Amino acid sequence: MTSSEIIEMLKEAEVLLEGHFLLTSGRHSDRYMQCAKIFQNAKYSVPLCAELAEKYKDDNIEVVIGPAIGAIQMAYEVGKQLGVKNIFAERENGKMTLRRGFTIDKGQKVLIVEDVVTTGGSVREVMELVKECGGEIVGIGSIVDRTGGKIDFGVPYKSAFSMDITSYEPDECPICKTGEPLVKPGSRGVK
């Protein structure tokens, strides 16, 4: 898929929102990628996850994991495309954990997926969990990279689409100065 085809798909799915948003990282932005909308229709989710799975098809992935809630369906679909186990991590008492009988065996090759990467906070938490379990992180994958390729996880990071969307520290946000109400659309549950 070309970047322009992906942009058209994101527009059609009404994923890109404009306004004044509080991101899960605590930063503010004038644009928000509501990637959950991708997963309400297989017309969008299947080809985007297939695009990402294709980038890792030769890496002998054994497990695909994503943080709840945003990457549960994504981990499933990428895992399905790769023909491997898929699980998700949940935050419990402020820390990412494996529950529901999910496991990562020592030495298993793991792909971590996330719908949107802005600061990489949730991804880094899942990376720590995978390391604690003894898994080998082969790479990170996202549908949207909001950093425009600027983030470094220390392992290969590939996205279906990359877009540099500006975000601001709250005390430096020009949108706050206009008085436009702040909207918190995310679901990470971190204060």
Please tell me what each predicted stretch does:
Residues 3-9, 127-191:
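PRPP-dependent phosphoribosyltransferase catalytic core
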Residues 54, 76, 80, 128, ...:
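Short, well-ordered alpha-helices that flank and scaffold nucleotide-derived cofactor binding pockets
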Residues 59-68:
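Short glycine-rich phosphate-binding loop at a beta-alpha junction
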Residues 64-65, 87, 138, 158:
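Structural detector of well-ordered beta-strand residues that form the stable sheet scaffold
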